[in-house]
Amino acid sequence: MGLEAFLPVALVIGYLLGSIPFGLVLTRLAGTQDIRSIGSGSIGATNVLRTGRKSLAAGTLLLDALKGTVAVVIAGYIAGPNAAMAAGLGAFLGHLFPVWLKFKGGKGVAVYIGILLGLFWPAAVVFCLLWLATAFTTRYSSLSALVASFITPMFLWWFGHLALSALFAVLTLLLFYAHRENIKRLQSGKESRIGEKA
């Protein structure tokens, strides 16, 4: 199999890894309520935090990020950078639209960071710093993710990573789509702040 022929395989492998709903798995194992029935209904770390279980939220954040990192590292090792990017796209799509949960997944922030970490780690550091700065000043997790993801493709473009910039422009659009209800709540002043329970 040629390297280009491996791209669809990388996309599928990434999707399958990304579709593992760690937030739902961890909260069920811990005996908490169905994470999809509280807060935003998302299976991601921010919504897990609304259960009041910080350890579960941290575990979800770590495992969701690792989905993206593992996908791109494995695909990149096997078939090079294009396969790594395909796997990253697949992992992101898998997290947002997991087939196991009727295509209703998370918002993609942790996976976004994990993909960045695997493809160009300085951009992951910049993303996290932007997220932290915005979160510190506003206490809105959603706004922090939107700001950081909006700037990330420009950061990659500035440093000459044009293919990565294009990939993350697509991921940013998907992330904004996943946060469409958050954006409406931010505009109306009804968005929950970090640490607030549902």
From Swiss-Prot:
Entry EC number(s): 2.3.1.275
Record's catalysed reaction(s): an acyl phosphate + sn-glycerol 3-phosphate = a 1-acyl-sn-glycero-3-phosphate + phosphate
Membrane-spanning residues: 6-26, 56-78, 83-101, 113-133, 155-175
GO terms for MF: acyl-phosphate glycerol-3-phosphate acyltransferase activity
Alphabetized InterPro entries for the sequence: G3P_acylTferase_PlsY
Keywords assigned by UniProt, alphabetized: Cell inner membrane, Cell membrane, Lipid biosynthesis, Lipid metabolism, Membrane, Phospholipid biosynthesis, Phospholipid metabolism, Transferase, Transmembrane, Transmembrane helix
Top-level taxon: Bacteria
Matches recorded under SMART domains: G3P_acyltransf
One GO CC term on file: plasma membrane
GO biological process, one term: phospholipid biosynthetic process
One family name in Pfam for this protein: G3P_acyltransf
Tagged with keyword Membrane: yes
Pathway(s) of this molecule: Lipid metabolism; phospholipid metabolism
Top enzyme class: transferase
Primary location recorded for the protein, binned into one broad class: membrane
Membrane topology listed for this record: Multi-pass membrane protein
Subcellular location(s) per record: Cell inner membrane
NCBIfam families tied to this protein: glycerol-3-phosphate 1-O-acyltransferase PlsY (TIGR00023)
Role description: Catalyzes the transfer of an acyl group from acyl-phosphate (acyl-PO(4)) to glycerol-3-phosphate (G3P) to form lysophosphatidic acid (LPA). This enzyme utilizes acyl-phosphate as fatty acyl donor, but not acyl-CoA or acyl-ACP.
Family to which the UniProt record says this protein belongs: Belongs to the PlsY family.
Subunit and interaction comment: Probably interacts with PlsX.
Name of the protein described by the UniProt record: Glycerol-3-phosphate acyltransferase
Lineage: Bacteria, Pseudomonadati, Pseudomonadota, Alphaproteobacteria, Hyphomicrobiales
